[in-house]
Amino acid sequence: MGLQPEEARPRLAALGFCAEDVETLAAHFLDAEARGRSGHGLARIEWLESFEALDPDARPERLVAEPEYERWDGAGALGYLTLAAVVDAQLAAPPPRARLVVCSRTFPTGALGYWIRPLARAGLVALLTATSPRRLPPPGGGAPLTGTNPLAIAIPSSDGDPVVADVSMGAVTHGDVLAGRAQAEELVPFGGPQAHKAFALAVGLQLFVDALDPEDGFGAVLLVARPEADPVPGLRELAAGARLPGDR
């Protein structure tokens, strides 16, 4: 039997995280479980317990703060906590129109849609991608060239119910392997005969982040903007009750 929900906070506290960080991390893991995404859920706490270089006292740093651009450094903090700090900063001071945020040394990042959902609920459009260890080979086989490199997009709605699309480029995620829901050999681009499309997007996202991030290691890039229109209610009407991305 895996980790139980009531064990999440005590186990995180035992790793040395402060109460605020325990709550941030636990909320993310429990939300992932509630959405059926156990690869980003409680299994990750056991994974963190195996980290030899875990520094629960590390704090992300904002190195550049301009109206349309920010750069952050994880500075040894978990990527989850870096993204939480970045999102809090955008909510506290939204961009005049649009802002690009580049995050260096930001890993692991978890379920990206979770981090940008609050931005959409606050009336902002958001797009977030992040790199990860190279685990996806090209279709047809070969050495792994890219991470699963997820992409999440959140669109606000005047009805208060944003659409949040969150897709990994892998047929499964590394988290699914950690949670025992998939085998390592299943880490290939999704799409079967059309896997070249997911692989192309994984490569594009990898290079996009790498080109903007001046540091070695894994990074994330967030675009946050004020919307000029309100397309979600119309789409929901057309959907006639069908589930849209991010719905529970």
Q: Whereabouts are the PLM-identified features?
A:
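Phosphate/diphosphate-binding glycine-rich loops and adjacent basic-rich segments that engage nucleotide
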Residues: 134-186
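Acidic, glycine/proline-rich low-complexity segments that act as flexible tails and inter-domain linkers
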Residues: 6, 10-21, 25, 38-57
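Active-site cofactor/substrate anionic-group-binding motifs, chiefly glycine-
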Residues: 41-91
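A generic, well-ordered mixed alpha/beta core segment in the N-terminal half of proteins
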Residues: 69-142, 152-155
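Catalytic-core signal marking the mid-to-C-terminal active-site face
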Residues: 2-7, 217-248
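Flexible, glycine/charged-enriched surface loops at secondary-structure junctions
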Residues: 19-24, 38-42, 214-222, 243-248
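Small-residue-enriched flexible segments
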Residues: 165, 171-213
